[in-house]
From Swiss-Prot:
It comes from Maricaulis maris (strain MCS10). Binds 1 zinc ion per subunit. This is Cysteine--tRNA ligase. A motif ('HIGH' region) lies at residues 32-42. The keyword Nucleotide-binding applies. One of its GO terms (molecular function) is ATP binding. The lineage of its organism: Bacteria, Pseudomonadati, Pseudomonadota, Alphaproteobacteria, Maricaulales. GO terms for cellular component: cytosol. Its cofactor is Zn(2+). The gene is cysS. It comes from the Bacteria.
Length: 461
């Protein structure tokens, strides 16, 4: 079996994955800031790293992989949302955290092993800041505690930026209490109407970068195997996480592998709330099965940009119809216990090459469709389901997928008969009969789609 290779942003190349302890593989991924609904761009890292989570658990064992994805529940945007709504911050954060879990669950995203909340880790954050102050890597100024970027000589290595160039290119007004424009906030004073906690520097709250460093250390250790997130987090968030964690831990690396997924775009623009070009997962799942959205997010390599369009979703649905059409035709054949086929695994082990894995999945669907004996069908069905499951796909009931579960048996038998008649007419090139049967099916509100594995149909509302 091929080894797992992953593209490490720090090394700027693919590397064989070698966990520090195969009995305890650790992964931390930056999760949502819960002040509003998640858009489909926010769902991309959730789906990407859920897929990696599945791969790692298959390689090392379900109980040997510890995956932490945090919840940021203290933030300027959260505070502003609470002010505008007149609701307590705790109500805002718990409400949107619940919706986030439900929306991601609809996309087949499994829950992480650990879901730490920032506000549950204030003592750890204060302790890390104290450590940085005592060791000369941070300083107090005007009620703030800031990280002294000049004290960490490798700052900018992850994002491949030069510190002097960053300082020279600073275009925003620099706070007077900063020694350098590049210094960033570890702890900030809290206003009377803002959430705050007592600290050696007065009542305040943590900076965003500090939160992830403290939570990662608390639950996974000083050096973890994998740290992931969107490419927009490389700088400044992950760069700052590295600086404060390495300096707090006497030079120990924060993570051995840094993984970043590409942007989701609408046209030529990155999808973002600030640009107002977002599509909310909460809305999309009203019009599409969550599996369609998940599949669409996997059609491009995770490091590449992905353009989100209605055409992409239409193609994705047709692709899933082909897979479920094969599973439906296999009917009552019980899937044989099967391992994931090697060619499919090879694609996933090559830096999560999901486009290649999806291509292999359709090869398996074709094999299942061509199987003749019940033994061959059972084996092919088992392999198809095992591979699809690695991607979080193909686990729904085929009849439910096509909207057939509530059909009267007599009506279903009639439709099946019409489908067979139309297929026979098409094979005999009797186009008038085929068209006439299709008209009958349209009158019954039946949508027929023809594909390489045969025709599939669904009952329309």
């Amino acid at each position: 079996m091929t080894s797992l290779t992953l593209f490490d942003t720090m090394a700027r190349r693919k590397r064989d994955f070698e966990p520090t302890d195969p009995g305890r593989v650790t992964m931390y991924v930056c999760g949502p800031t819960v002040y509003s609904y998640a858009h489909i761009g926010n769902a991309r890292p959730a789906v990407v790293f859920d897929t990696l989570f599945r791969v790692l658990r298959r390689l090392y064992g379900e109980d040997q992989v510890i995956y932490a994805r945090n919840i940021t529940d203290v933030d300027d945007k959260i505070i502003e949302t609470a002010r505008e709504s007149g609701k307590p911050i705790e109500d805002i954060t718990s409400h949107y955290a619940d919706i986030y879990r439900a929306d991601m669950g609809a996309l087949g995203v499994t829950l992480p092993t650990i879901e730490p909340h920032a506000t549950d880790h204030i003592p750890e954050m204060i302790g890390m800041v104290q450590n940085l102050v005592y060791s000369g890597h941070a300083y107090e100024a005007d009620g703030h505690v800031l990280f002294d970027v000049s004290s960490y000589e490798k700052y900018g290595r992850l994002s491949n930026r030069d510190l002097d160039d960053m300082i020279a290119g600073a275009r925003v007004e620099v706070a007077s209490y900063k020694r350098s424009p590049a210094d960033f906030v570890l702890w900030k004073p809290a206003k009377d109407d803002e959430p705050g906690w007592d600290s050696p520097w007065g009542r305040g709250r943590p900076g965003w970068h500090l939160e992830c460093s403290a939570m990662s250390e608390k639950h996974l250790g000083k050096t973890i195997d994998i740290h992931g997130g969107g490419t927009d987090l490389v700088f400044p968030h992950h760069e700052n996480e590295i600086a404060q964690s390495v300096c707090a831990h006497k030079g120990a690396p924060m993570a051995n592998y840094w993984l970043h997924n590409g942007f989701l775009t609408m046209g030529t623009d990155k999808m973002s709330k600030s640009l107002g070009n977002v599509q909310l997962v909460h809305d999309l799942i009203k019009d599409y099965p969550g599996e369609v959205l998940r599949y669409a997010l996997l059609t491009a390599h995770y490091r590449a940009p992905l353009t989100w369009t209605a055409d992409l979703l239409a193609k994705t649905r047709r692709s899933l119809d082909r897979i479920y059409g094969v599973l439906r035709r296999l009917g009552e054949i019980e899937a044989a216990p099967s391992d994931v086929p090697p060619a499919f695994l090879e694609a996933l082990h090559d830096d999560l090459n999901t486009p290649k894995a999806l291509s292999e999945l359709f090869q398996l669907a074709g094999n299942a469709n061509k199987a003749l004996s019940d033994v061959e069908k059972a084996q092919a069905k088992g392999e198809l389901l095992a591979a699809a499951g690695m991607l979080g796909l193909g686990q729904a009931d085929p009849d439910a997928w096509f909207g057939l579960t509530d059909l009267d048996p007599a009506e279903r038998a009639r439709i099946d008969d019409l489908i067979v008649r139309r297929q026979t007419a098409r094979e005999e090139k009797d186009w008038p009969t085929a068209d006439a049967v299709r008209d009958e099916l349209n009158a019954l509100k039946v949508q027929v789609d023809d594909g390489p594995e045969g025709s599939t149909w669904r009952k329309l509302d």
